[in-house]
C-alpha cells in the first residue's frame, strides 16, 4: 500500500508546480509578445526582482507578521464563538429553526460593506480588523460544524448512551471528535477567508500590515509591488490551509482506525 501511494504523493507535489510553471510561462509570453506596458502588467522577472528587494527589508517581515497575526487572531475568535453556537443549533431544534434561515443571507454580505460599520462601532486600528476576520470565518465554521454534527452515525451515539455517556461527556468524547473532520474543513476554508478579511480591513480601517502596503503601492502605481504583496498573501493563505488540511487528514485517519 505504501508503494502504491508514492506515485500519488509525487503527483500531488508535482502537479501544482507544473501548473505554476505553465502559468508563469504564459504570463511571460503575454508580456513579451504583446508589448503591454509594464505598469499594466509587469513581466515575472520584474516581479521577482521586486519581491527579492522587498523581502530584504525588515519592515516587510513586520508587515507580514501583523497581517498574519490579525488573520490568526480573527480566526481564533470566530472559532471560539462559532463552535458553541453550532453545537447549540445541533442540539436545539427551535434555535436551529430560528437561526438557520438567516445564515445564507449573512454569508452573502461582502467584507467591504461590513468594514465601515465596524469603524463606527470600534474605531480604527487592529481591533476592528480582527473582528472583521472573525466575521469572515464565523459562518463557514458554523455551517460546517452543524453539518458535521448532523451526519454523525446515530448508532454510535446510541451505543455511547447505553454506556452512560450524556451531556458534556457525550459532546467531548463522541460528538465533537466524530465531527472533527468537518470542523477542520470549515477551519481550513476559514483561515483563507481570514487573510482576505485582514487585508480588506487594513485597506479600509487602517493598520500597519500588508493591506496598507497594497494601498500605498496602488497609489504609487507600483504594479510589480502589488503583485508581490498578492503573492505573499497567497503563500500565507496556502500555508495556513495546508497546516489545517494535514491536521484534518490525520483526524480522518484516526477515526477510520
Functional labels for PLM-detected ranges:
Residues 1-19, 242-257:
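Transmembrane alpha-helical segments of polytopic membrane transport and secretion proteins
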Residues 3-4, 33-76:
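Periplasmic/extracellular loop-to-transmembrane helix junction in inner-membrane transport proteins
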Residues 73-103:
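Transmembrane-helix boundary motif in ABC transporter permease subunits
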Amino acid at each position: 500500500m505504501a508503494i502504491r501511494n508514492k506515485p500519488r504523493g509525487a503527483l500531488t507535489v508535482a502537479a501544482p508546480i507544473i501548473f505554476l510553471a505553465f502559468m508563469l510561462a504564459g504570463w511571460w509570453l503575454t508580456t513579451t509578445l504583446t508589448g503591454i506596458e509594464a505598469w499594466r502588467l509587469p513581466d515575472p522577472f520584474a516581479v521577482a526582482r521586486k519581491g527579492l528587494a522587498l523581502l530584504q527589508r525588515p519592515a516587510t517581515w513586520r508587515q507580514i507578521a501583523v497581517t498574519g497575526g490579525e488573520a490568526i487572531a480573527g480566526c481564533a475568535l470566530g472559532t471560539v464563538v462559532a463552535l458553541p453556537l453550532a453545537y447549540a443549533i445541533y442540539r436545539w431544534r427551535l434555535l436551529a429553526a430560528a437561526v438557520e434561515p438567516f445564515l445564507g443571507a449573512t454569508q452573502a454580505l461582502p467584507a467591504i460593506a461590513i468594514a465601515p460599520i465596524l469603524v463606527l462601532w470600534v474605531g480604527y486600528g487592529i481591533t476592528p480588523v480582527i473582528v472583521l476576520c472573525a466575521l469572515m470565518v464565523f459562518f463557514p465554521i458554523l455551517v460546517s460544524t452543524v453539518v458535521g454534527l448532523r451526519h454523525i452515525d446515530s448508532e454510535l451515539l446510541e451505543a455511547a448512551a447505553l454506556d452512560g455517556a450524556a451531556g458534556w461527556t457525550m459532546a467531548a468524547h463522541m460528538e465533537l471528535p466524530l465531527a472533527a473532520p468537518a470542523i477542520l474543513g470549515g477551519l481550513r476554508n476559514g483561515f483563507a477567508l481570514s487573510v482576505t478579511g485582514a487585508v480588506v480591513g487594513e485597506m479600509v480601517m487602517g493598520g500597519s500590515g500588508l493591506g496598507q502596503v497594497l494601498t500605498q503601492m496602488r497609489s504609487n502605481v507600483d504594479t510589480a509591488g502589488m503583485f508581490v504583496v498578492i503573492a505573499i498573501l497567497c503563500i500565507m493563505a496556502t500555508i495556513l490551509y495546508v497546516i489545517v488540511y494535514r491536521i484534518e487528514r490525520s483526524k480522518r485517519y484516526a477515526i477510520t482506525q
